[in-house]
Amino acid sequence: RRDRFSTIRQPDGLNGFMLRTESEHDCYGAGHAGTALSAALGMAVARDLAGGHEHVVAVAGDAAFTNGISFEALNNIAVQTQRMIVVLNDNEWSIDRNVGAVARYFHRIVTNEHYQHMHQRATRLIERFGGKTAVKVVRRAEEAAKSMLWPSILFEEFGLEYFGPIDGHNLPLLVETFKFLKTLDHPVLLHILTQKGRGFQPALDGQKKFHGLGPYDPETGKTPDGSPTWAELFATSLADLADKDPRIVAITAAMPNGTGLDHFRPRHPNRYFDVGIAEEHAVVFAAGMATRGFRPVCAIYSTFLQRAFDPVVHDVCLQKLPVLFCMDRAGLSGDDGPTHHGLFDIAYLRGIPGITLMAPKDEDELADMLKTALDLPGPSAIRYPRGSAAGVVCKPQPQALPIGKAEVLSDGSDVAILGLGPMISLAKDLAATLERDGYSAAVINPRFIKPIDRETLEHYASRVAAFVTFEDHVKMGGFGSAVAEALEEMGLAVPVVRIGWPDQFIEHGKVDQLRARYGITVEAALAQVLPLLTRRQRRALVAS
């Protein structure tokens, strides 16, 4: 893949994450942190059962150890297999700075002066002599230091022998260390120290920004200026509401920059909580705060909320707690691909009793929905996409919306077009196209996915030949399905043309190109709705 590296995260180019179908060297697909140890243990046990002798190495960043699944795997490694190597790649970063007791523990190891002195000597020894003898000397020195400094290193309590920390950029040292570790007959953990962005000064200076970004100036590291994003506007609106309501608290799972909460944090530092890459904990933590009268807002990517589905059901919704989930990156995420698209949240949330689901068409409506949700007595969720917002000027003060009531933007009698959230732009474009052909089209901003506005649906069902729904979500279980279900339950036999993503994982690429490829377009909707309108006209002519 070396000669194709310039195509990474580009349409039809290399994926930004490991993908088994892309290369034999990608032994496991990954995009969400914390899975390395469990997957590697599964491979090691499979090797043992098959009588194999290959070495299995799990490489996990220090941030991944803030995720509970890593410790669940640690609890099983020494019990399930005799041979496995875990590499802890410690650079003190995930997307943002690592937080919590685990990060402090790693930092304490790294900054201990005895370890620093020992590893300086170890490095010189490896460089001078090399080979297994030098590694064994280093190992004995480490054992002496560990017994002196900590009676029981955390990982050794789990049954893994601990080595390190060593310089992760010293290739000769790494090679000799791995040669030695391969001779051992028990699970081991190697702690290596690396620098995020090493070798490129702008990346070292902007480690948060350079975690994942688009085009930039290679000389300065600067990126083009952009319009305010949905995430930034969400956080600013939330901070404004928090100015007046001391019950509002904001929670993120290691994504303060991505969710925009780094705009909330300076204004309300005591009501901002970063729990690390721990989505399940974030949700249950929010539930606990809600039981004591606070109004937790859990800002999380749609794709990452999947990791906390059970707590959403069991700890929040079952207890009818007023936790608000603000789901960033809802819809197609673009270049990050299938591990990061937010195409399933409507399907996995709308079946939960008692939750209110909303999708704003623009940033002004997002502020209104935040106000609305924070006034509710129970759980709620707001979904909004990645990237720049619509550029609408917000009202001075947000207003609570009537629950379950859609906004009719224009009336019509032939077809009713519902565009969920920012997909309202496609609904307007379809209406304009149909009206040029002589049809009367109603354009509706649903606002609420649940409860759905049955009154408005019933009103138009008696007038139109068809409904059309646009959504940035899979069709199966999505908003269009909710419309069809509501009509069926009311005994209203009106066709519903659903424009959404198919029942498959969508690859990475530019949003507009992928929409064109998969028929999330006005043209695709037109091809499906015109026959229904033409049929209605023919029936009307026959009747007359």
Predicted regions and their residues:
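Cofactor-binding active-site loop characterized by glycine-rich and histidine/acidic residues
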Residues: R1-Q80, W230, R247-I248, T252-A253, ...
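A short, small-residue-rich loop immediately preceding and capping a beta-strand
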Residues: Y28-G29, G52-N67, M84-V87, I248-I251, ...
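Structural signature of the thiamine diphosphate
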Residues: A134-P202, P322-M327, I346-K395, T521-S544
